[in-house]
Amino acid sequence: MNIIEGNIRATGKKFALVVSRFNSFVVESLVEGALDTLERHGEVNSQDITLVRVPGAYELPIAAKKLAEKGTFDGIIALGAVIRGGTPHFEFVAGECNKGLAQVSLEFGIPVSFGVITTDSIEQAIERSGTKAGNKGAEAALGALEMVNVMANIEGAE
């Protein structure tokens, strides 16, 4: 039996972070977590990281698609925060963001890591951006690092 796995070292690999400006008080902590993870754990050089800012989570998929079309990135990490309000807007934005990012990954065959937190309250968002519940930006970066290696290992497998 052949087992294909990945590790989190990605020296020489190129990553793009697509980041929502909306709810920046939470998202900036996700960005810090992702960058720290890429550089410290993944050993990715800061020159191999591109950060793209978009207005909100709904715009993340189209920016991720444009980056994937370039063919220069090994992995893309999408970061944002969608916090439930009093209208159905939350479901539309969160759902379309999720579907769009998954479609980019499947269409272009590169990992697109989902670091968009979807919460019922501001308190939950803060918890998931670096306090009680860890940092979902760091977790998304770890997933991207591992998947970049998994994809390379699948490509090289006999």
From Swiss-Prot:
Cited function: Catalyzes the formation of 6,7-dimethyl-8-ribityllumazine by condensation of 5-amino-6-(D-ribitylamino)uracil with 3,4-dihydroxy-2-butanone 4-phosphate. This is the penultimate step in the biosynthesis of riboflavin.
Binding positions for 5-amino-6-(D-ribitylamino)uracil per the UniProt entry: F22, A57, Y58, E59, A81, V82, I83, F114
Species of origin: Pseudoalteromonas atlantica (strain T6c / ATCC BAA-1087)
Keyword Transferase: yes
Ranges in a coiled coil: none
Name the UniProt record assigns to this protein: 6,7-dimethyl-8-ribityllumazine synthase
UniProt EC number: 2.5.1.78
Pathway the protein acts in: Cofactor biosynthesis; riboflavin biosynthesis; riboflavin from 2-hydroxy-3-oxobutyl phosphate and 5-amino-6-(D-ribitylamino)uracil: step 1/2
List of catalytic residues: H89 (proton donor)
One GO molecular-function entry: 6,7-dimethyl-8-ribityllumazine synthase activity
